[in-house]
């Protein structure tokens, strides 16, 4: 995982009016907290931060008054209509420190031939990983799975140094028979019974 370097400026003005002024300057108000330190209020360059946040669990290297600090996004607030960043909460991390994060579950391969549906019971997995080696996602094969099959959290291969932070027996994916096919079979069965009578 690569880190994104951002120049941060300390923020002394607070409140709705100050936040609006900051956003008008194409910057985003943010707060950095963690490790028992007092929260630090900063502003970040809006466009660079928006690009960085496209990567899930991005590691940010913040330059705050000449001091470099590592942080990961904890909460991101966006405008509901226009989608611009309103505020970001960042959690301080250290190299080598373990953190709990959610990673996306991707699938590869095809289900067995037939009309089957793949249900994503969980679209993300909570894992514990080193702050500087957080995986963007995990991938699991669904090749040849048929109706009734399920994939549990423990069945998903994780990168080295990453462990599950949820129940290992949690169902992540399951294969279902298509409803239309079942309805057609039931209708055909009912028609056969009706014709025999």
From Swiss-Prot:
SUPFAM superfamilies: Ribosomal protein L25-like. Pfam families: Ribosomal_L25p, Ribosomal_TL5_C. Belongs to the bacterial ribosomal protein bL25 family. CTC subfamily. This is Large ribosomal subunit protein bL25. One of its GO terms (molecular function) is 5S rRNA binding. The keyword RNA-binding applies. One of its GO terms (biological process) is translation. InterPro entries: Rbsml_bL25/Gln-tRNA_synth_N, Ribosomal_bL25/Gln-tRNA_synth, Ribosomal_bL25_b-dom, Ribosomal_bL25_C, Ribosomal_bL25_long, Ribosomal_L25_dom, Ribosomal_uL5_bac-type. Keywords: Ribonucleoprotein, Ribosomal protein, RNA-binding, rRNA-binding. GO terms for cellular component: cytosolic large ribosomal subunit. CDD domains: Ribosomal_L25_TL5_CTC. It comes from the Bacteria. This is one of the proteins that binds to the 5S RNA in the ribosome where it forms part of the central protuberance. The keyword Repressor does not apply. Part of the 50S ribosomal subunit; part of the 5S rRNA/L5/L18/L25 subcomplex. Contacts the 5S rRNA. Binds to the 5S rRNA independently of L5 and L18.
């Amino acid at each position: 995982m690569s880190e994104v370097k951002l120049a941060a400026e300390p923020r002394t003005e607070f409140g709705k009016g100050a936040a609006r002024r900051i956003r008008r300057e194409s910057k985003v108000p943010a707060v950095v907290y963690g490790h028992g330190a007092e929260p630090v209020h900063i502003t970040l360059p809006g466009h660079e931060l928006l690009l960085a946040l496209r990567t899930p669990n991005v590691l940010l290297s913040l330059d705050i008054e000449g001091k470099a600090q590592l942080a990961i996004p904890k909460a991101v607030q966006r405008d509901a209509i226009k989608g611009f960043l309103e505020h970001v909460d960042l959690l301080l991390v250290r190299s080598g420190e373990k953190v709990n994060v959610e990673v996306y579950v991707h699938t590869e391969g095809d289900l067995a031939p037939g009309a089957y549906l793949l249900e994503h019971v969980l679209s993300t997995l909570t894992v514990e990983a080193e702050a500087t080696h957080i995986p963007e996602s995990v991938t699991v094969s669904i090749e040849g799975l048929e109706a009734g099959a399920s994939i549990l959290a423990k069945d998903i291969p994780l990168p080295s140094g990453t462990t599950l932070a949820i129940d290992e027996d949690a169902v992540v994916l399951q294969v279902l028979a298509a409803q239309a096919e079942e309805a057609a079979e039931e209708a055909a069965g009912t028609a056969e019974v009706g014709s025999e009578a």
